[in-house]
UniProtKB/Swiss-Prot annotation:
This is Protein YtjE. It comes from the Bacteria. It comes from Escherichia coli (strain K12). Induction: Identified when cells are grown in rich medium (at protein level).
Amino acid sequence: MSRFIFYKIILSKQKDM
């Protein structure tokens, strides 16, 4: 579950870029 959250954060960061 921890990885899922981490993945979501990375995706969100990429969208911000």
